A protein has these predicted regions:
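N-terminal cationic and glycine-rich segments that engage phosphates or anionic surfaces
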Residues: 1-125, 130-139, 208, 249
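Positively charged, low-complexity, intrinsically disordered RNA-binding extensions
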Residues: 139-249
Length: 249
């Protein structure tokens, strides 16, 4: 099972804990505001905003919160001005780490992320150092209990998806970013509810980690995930599923 989808599954299992800390809503509000700022406040003509609203509703965010986040993005309401950019670095064993950042204070965020890397066995890298190791893909994770392989394969192919992979307890659908919405809609129309879905950065190759290096990498991932300005963490580690599930527990 590939590292990025294993970690996505772990994050899904830990979602209730994250929600208690308010981090899910904070990140979704930032994403909605930036999407509205960059592409306008109409979700019908702004695919990124449409996806952010779908994600917010899936987490039971109140409609008023969504509306205010859109209005802050379009400038109809006052609020913080967010900047989005990527940060790159390395974990133990030369594992690549790519971060999606949304922040209202670049200097503060860069300093804090640099500290998180250094404290947890990693180090920051220059722009472009690891981003070339990843490519953008639509990534839809579905529990095997929710769909049979043949049925799901037919849906994926008809909707324009690229691949259907066996990831242990789950099926993983990969799409081109342009086909992501159509494939996700087709899956849901068939009555299948994904465990998670997003357009994400997927590594081209993976680095196997075991023992102390694996534990250090998990600590680094958790430290980065904890930061309020980090929207997403992408990495090319491959760590045993059992160890990751112990962390999720």
């Amino acid at each position: 099972m590939s590292g990025h989808s294993k970690w996505a599954t772990i994050k899904h299992k830990k979602g209730a804990l994250d929600a208690k800390r308010g981090k899910i809503f904070t990140r979704l509000i930032k994403e909605i505001s930036i999407a509205a700022k960059n592409g306008g406040g109409d979700p019908d003509s702004n695919p990124r905003l449409r996806g952010a609203i779908v994600a917010a509703k899936a987490e039971n965010m109140p409609a008023d919160n969504i509306k205010r986040a859109i209005q802050r993005g379009t400038g109809e309401l006052p609020g913080a001005t967010y900047e989005e950019f990527s940060l790159e670095g390395y974990g133990p064993g030369g594992v690549a780490v790519l971060l999606d950042i949304n922040t209202d204070n670049r200097n503060r965020t860069v300093s804090e992320i640099r500290h998180a890397f250094g404290k947890n066995g990693g180090n920051m890298a220059e722009a472009g150092a690891v981003s070339w190791m990843f490519h953008k893909k639509g990534d839809i994770i579905i529990p095997k209990t929710a769909a049979k392989e043949d049925d799901l394969m037919n849906i994926v192919l008809e909707a324009g998806g690229d691949d259907l992979n066996d990831d242990g307890e789950n099926w993983e659908i990969l799409t081109e970013p342009s086909a992501f919405e159509a494939v996700l809609e087709a899956v849901k129309k068939a009555g299948i509810e994904p465990a998670s879905s997003s357009v994400t950065s997927i590594p081209q190759n993976y680095i196997k980690l075991e023992g102390a290096a694996a534990n250090t990498m998990i600590r680094l991932m958790e430290a980065l995930e904890e930061h309020d300005d980090v929207q997403n963490v992408h990495s090319n580690f491959d760590i045993d599923q059992k160890l990751l599930e112990e962390v999720a527990g």
